[in-house]
Amino acid sequence: MRQNTILENVTSAQLRTDIPAFRAGDTVKVYAKIVEGSRERVQLFEGVVIKRKGAGIQATYTVRKISSGVGVERTFPLHSPRVEKIEVTRFGQVRRAKLYYLRALQGKAARIKERRRDV
């Protein structure tokens, strides 16, 4: 067997199927498992997806939120077992794949228009 097919077989078993469709500009709730000593708890991180990167098992996404007036960004692996679930709360309409310009904006200027969805 070739190296590539072995790698594909191993990674395809690790891929998650419960991931909703989301893209840059969408507001998501990420339920991440946090280990503190011997305890494990779920921490909610809600914010705007500012980028998606990679494909397959290496895919990641970065979520940005404002906490106490300070911008906080967190990058999650898309297929990580440490992420319990992802919920999309708003679908944003943007014309860029990477929303790094949001870092320089604050308040109402950082708002994202909502995308219309067909039912």
UniProtKB/Swiss-Prot annotation:
InterPro entries: Ribosomal_bL19, Ribosomal_bL19_CS, Ribosomal_bL19_sf, Translation_prot_SH3-like_sf. One of its GO terms (cellular component) is cytosolic large ribosomal subunit. This protein is located at the 30S-50S ribosomal subunit interface and may play a role in the structure and function of the aminoacyl-tRNA binding site. GO terms for molecular function: structural constituent of ribosome. Pfam families: Ribosomal_L19. PROSITE patterns: RIBOSOMAL_L19. The keyword Protease does not apply. GO terms for biological process: translation. It comes from Leuconostoc mesenteroides subsp. mesenteroides (strain ATCC 8293 / DSM 20343 / BCRC 11652 / CCM 1803 / JCM 6124 / NCDO 523 / NBRC 100496 / NCIMB 8023 / NCTC 12954 / NRRL B-1118 / 37Y). This is Large ribosomal subunit protein bL19. The gene is rplS.
